[in-house]
Amino acid sequence: MEERNEQVVEETKEAQTEEATIEKNSEESVTEEATEETVVEEKSEAALLQEKVDELQAKLTETEGRMLRLQADFENYKRRVQLDKQAAEKYRAQSLVSDILPALDNFERAMQVEASDEQTKSLLQGMEMVYRQLLEALNKEGVEMIEAVGKQFDPHEHQAVMQVEDSEFESNAVVEEFQKGYKLKDRVIRPSMVKVNQ
């Protein structure tokens, strides 16, 4: 009977070992399947995450481009404002000078009158002094007369009102000036009205 008990114990052990092996194999199989599913899930998650990264990278690149364009636009705006401010400062006297030019023309015409008596001569001398002081004040602001007679005609500085043929002058030279022209710094306020040789 003891043999029989030993045999039963042995068979039970073998059965338990077989069950354990089957269970172990079953667990390994389940683990392998789970691992494969996990790998597939991780791959699809990785693909989704990569898509998201690519999408965010594209948005970042677009945003950086917009930011750089805005920054360049702002720098250009600042430069334009600075140039406008400098031009406004540089040419601030332009409207005043434009208003004074007709008075200068009248002074010049008045001083061309021939004085016959002492009273008229002294009046003309006083007008000439005022005229010179006015010119000096304008010169301090950067106003200067445009030279015309004997110079080559320049459409930016001269306005041709007549043409003549005169062998004493070169072709396209200014022969006579009817009204003086003026510049404020480098900007022509009023062109000279001139007669030009053909």
Curated annotation (Swiss-Prot):
It comes from the Bacteria. This is Protein GrpE. SUPFAM superfamilies: Coiled-coil domain of nucleotide exchange factor GrpE, Head domain of nucleotide exchange factor GrpE. Residues 29-39 have a biased composition (Acidic residues). Signal peptide: none annotated. Homodimer. GO terms for molecular function: adenyl-nucleotide exchange factor activity; protein homodimerization activity; protein-folding chaperone binding; unfolded protein binding. The lineage of its organism: Bacteria, Bacillati, Bacillota, Bacilli, Bacillales. Residues 1-27 have a biased composition (Basic and acidic residues). The gene is grpE. GO terms for cellular component: cytoplasm. Participates actively in the response to hyperosmotic and heat shock by preventing the aggregation of stress-denatured proteins, in association with DnaK and GrpE. It is the nucleotide exchange factor for DnaK and may function as a thermosensor. Unfolded proteins bind initially to DnaJ; upon interaction with the DnaJ-bound protein, DnaK hydrolyzes its bound ATP, resulting in the formation of a stable complex. GrpE releases ADP from DnaK; ATP binding to DnaK triggers the release of the substrate protein, thus completing the reaction cycle. Residues 1-39 are annotated as: Disordered.
